[in-house]
A protein has these predicted regions:
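Active-site capping/gating regions of soluble enzymes
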Residues: 17-18, 26-33, 38-48, 52-121, ...
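ATP/Mg2+-dependent ligation/transfer catalytic cores
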Residues: 1-210, 228-242, 253, 389-390, ...
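Histidine-centered divalent-metal-coordination microenvironment in nucleic-acid enzymes
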Residues: 114, 153-167, 210-224, 258-280
Length: 499
C-alpha cells in the first residue's frame, strides 16, 4: 500500500492512483472524461501575488488536446507591469499537469491547473517568479547535492460582526477553542478545500490576535503546511490564499492576510520553514543537534536577511509589524525556540524517545525517523510577499552560506546566535532589519549580485522590484504613522488585500 495515495484528499490522486508529480496529459484527459469535467481553468499568480484565471470551455476532444498542449497567450504587461512594456507584452501560459485539481467552488465541473509563462521564442519567461524559483532550486541542488524543501505558516484574520457572546481575551487567542474562537469550523472547511487542491497541511489553529473594534470581531488564524520541494511549497501557499478568500466570500466573511491591521495588536506573518534533504535524509540534524550544514545555511540567511525583505515584505505596512514585543523579529540573529529572533530553530523531536508509548501503554515503540521533522524558520516575511521570489531568495541565501569558506560561515553563525539568557537582555547589539521598502531597496542594490549569480534572478526582475518598492516612498513613514492614527488607518486600508 502506498501511504501517500491512500486517503489522499486530491480526487485526481485518488482516481489515478499515482502522486501528482507523475500526472501526464493522458491522465488529465482520462480524469476529465470519467468525471464529466466541462471546463478548464488556467491559473497563474501575477506581479501583485494574486492568482489570475483564464476559463476554457471543453468544446470537444480536439480543443481539449490543443489547450493542454499549446496553452494560450496572455497580456504580460497587465500581469507584470514592472517587468514588461505594452509594446512587446504577449506571453504564453502553459499548464503544469502536476498541479491539476478540481475546483471546489465551480458549479460547472471545472479542472484547474497552475501555469508557467513562456516568451515569444518559446523560452521560459526570465522574469516569471515561478521560473526564478525553479532556477534557484536547481542551482541549490547543483551546488550542494541537496534538495531544498520548505513549508509556510499562513496567518490571516477573519472579520465578522460581533454578537457580543463568549468574547475571547484580547491578544490571548492562541489555540483557543469554540465558542471563544468563532471561526474554527470556517478554518477546518478551508483546510479541507486546500487539501483537495493538493495542499499538504500539517495543522490549523487560532492564533494570538483576537480583538473587537467598531462592532467587529477580528480573529487571527493559522494554517501550517508540511515540508515539500520548494517549488511545490510555493504553489500550495498561493492556492491556499485563493481558497481562503473564496470561501470567506461564500460565507459572508472578510479575510485579510495584511501584515498589520491596527496598532498594538498582533500582525500576520508568513513564516517559512526550511530543511535540506539528501537521499531521503534530513541534513539539518546530526547526532541529535543542528548540523554544520544547517548552521552554514543560517549564516547565509544572516548575511542576506536585509535584502530578503525586498521579496518578503512588499508594503510599507509590512514594517509596522517588524517592531519589538509583537513576536516579530527586528534584528538579524538566530536562536533556539525564540520567537523574537529572525531565524528560529523550533523543537525537532531530537531526544530519540518515543513519547507516545508513555501515554499509550498498549502500543509498541514506533521507531519513526523523527529527524525528518527538524527545520529552521525565517520569521520576517509576511503575506505581501511574492512567495516565489521569497523562496528563491531563501534558496540563494542558504546556498551562499554553504558555498562560503566553512569556518567563516560557522563563525558568522556563532556570532549571530542568541542564547535564552542573552535574549532576555535584549538584541540591540545585532544589526537591525530595514524599516521601510526604501531601506530594503538599498540592501537589495548592495546584494543584488548574489541573487543574479548563476542566473537565478534576472537583472530585469531585480530592476523591476527596485522600481516597485521605491514607489512606496516610505522612508520614516513608520515613525510618522505611529503618531498619526488617521495616516495609519489609511495605510492599513491600502494593503488590506495585499498579496
Amino acid at each position: 500500500m502506498d501511504k501517500t495515495i491512500e486517503m489522499n484528499a486530491n480526487p485526481l490522486v485518488e482516481f489515478l492512483r499515482k502522486p501528482s508529480k507523475c500526472f501526464t496529459k493522458a491522465d488529465i484527459i482520462a480524469f476529465i472524461r470519467e468525471k464529466g469535467i466541462r471546463m478548464i481553468d488556467f491559473m497563474y499568480p501575477a506581479e501583485d501575488g494574486r492568482i489570475k484565471t483564464l476559463n476554457f470551455m471543453i468544446n470537444d476532444y480536439a480543443y481539449l488536446e490543443t489547450i493542454l498542449t499549446d496553452g494560450e497567450r496572455v497580456d504580460g504587461s497587465s500581469l507584470f507591469p514592472s517587468f514588461i512594456e505594452a509594446e512587446s507584452s504577449d506571453l504564453y501560459v502553459i499548464p503544469r499537469f502536476r498541479t491539476a485539481f478540481v475546483s471546489p467552488f465551480s458549479e460547472i465541473p471545472t479542472l484547474c491547473m497552475l501555469c508557467s509563462f513562456f516568451d515569444k521564442n518559446g523560452e521560459p519567461f526570465e522574469c516569471s517568479p515561478e521560473r526564478t524559483l525553479h532556477r534557484a532550486a536547481a542551482a541549490f541542488e547543483e551546488s550542494t547535492g541537496m534538495t531544498f524543501e520548505a513549508m509556510g505558516e499562513l496567518e490571516y484574520y477573519v472579520i465578522a460582526d460581533d454578537n457580543g457572546m463568549f468574547p475571547a481575551v484580547d491578544q490571548r487567542g492562541y489555540h483557543e477553542s469554540g465558542p471563544f474562537a468563532k471561526f474554527n469550523e470556517f478554518r477546518k472547511q478551508c483546510m479541507a478545500y486546500i487539501a483537495q487542491t493538493g495542499g499538504q497541511i500539517k495543522y490549523g489553529h487560532s492564533e494570538v490576535g483576537n480583538f473587537t473594534q467598531d462592532g467587529k470581531v477580528y480573529e487571527q488564524n493559522e494554517i501550517e503546511f508540511l515540508p515539500n520541494p520548494v517549488e511545490t511549497a510555493a504553489d500550495q501557499l498561493v492556492l491556499a490564499k485563493w481558497v481562503i478568500r473564496n470561501l470567506a466570500q461564500m460565507n459572508g466573511l472578510d479575510v485579510t492576510f495584511a501584515p498589520k491591521i491596527t496598532v498594538g495588536k498582533a500582525g500576520s506573518g508568513l513564516h517559512i520553514h526550511m530543511r535540506m534533504m539528501k537521499d531521503g535524509k534530513n541534513c539539518m540534524i546530526k547526532d541529535h543537534k543542528l548540523s554544520e550544514e544547517a548552521r552554514r545555511a543560517i549564516a547565509g540567511m544572516m548575511i542576506l536577511a536585509p535584502s530578503i525583505t525586498a521579496f518578503g515584505n512588499k508594503t510599507s505596512v509590512s514594517y509596522f509589524r517588524l517592531v519589538p514585543h509583537q513576536e516579530a523579529p527586528t534584528n538579524v540573529c538566530w536562536g533556539d525556540c525564540n520567537r523574537s529572533v529572525l531565524v528560529r530553530v523550533p523543537l525537532g523531536w531530537t531526544s530519540g524517545r518515543d513519547m507516545s508509548v508513555q501515554v499509550n501503554t498498549l502500543e509498541a515503540e514506533a521507531n519513526n525517523d523523527t529527524t525528518l521533522k527538524q527545520t529552521v524558520e525565517m520569521r520576517s516575511p509576511d503575506a505581501s510577499a511574492d512567495i516565489y521570489q521569497l523562496m528563491a531568495g531563501l534558496c540563494v541565501a542558504c546556498r551562499y552560506g554553504l558555498e562560503m569558506e566553512k569556518e567563516e560561515a560557522l563563525q558568522i553563525a556563532t556570532d549571530k546566535y542568541v542564547g535564552i539568557d542573552e535574549a532576555k537582555k535584549g538584541l540591540s547589539k545585532f544589526e537591525q532589519l530595514p524599516d521601510s521598502c526604501v531601506a530594503s531597496v538599498k540592501w537589495l542594490e548592495k546584494q543584488r549580485g548574489l541573487y543574479e549569480d548563476k542566473g537565478v534572478f534576472s537583472a530585469r526582475m531585480i530592476d523591476g522590484i527596485i522600481r516597485a518598492l521605491n514607489k512606496q516612498d516610505d522612508s520614516n513613514l513608520r515613525e510618522s504613522a505611529e503618531k498619526d492614527s488617521k495616516l495609519m488607518q489609511k495605510l492599513v486600508e491600502s494593503s488590506f488585500y495585499c498579496g
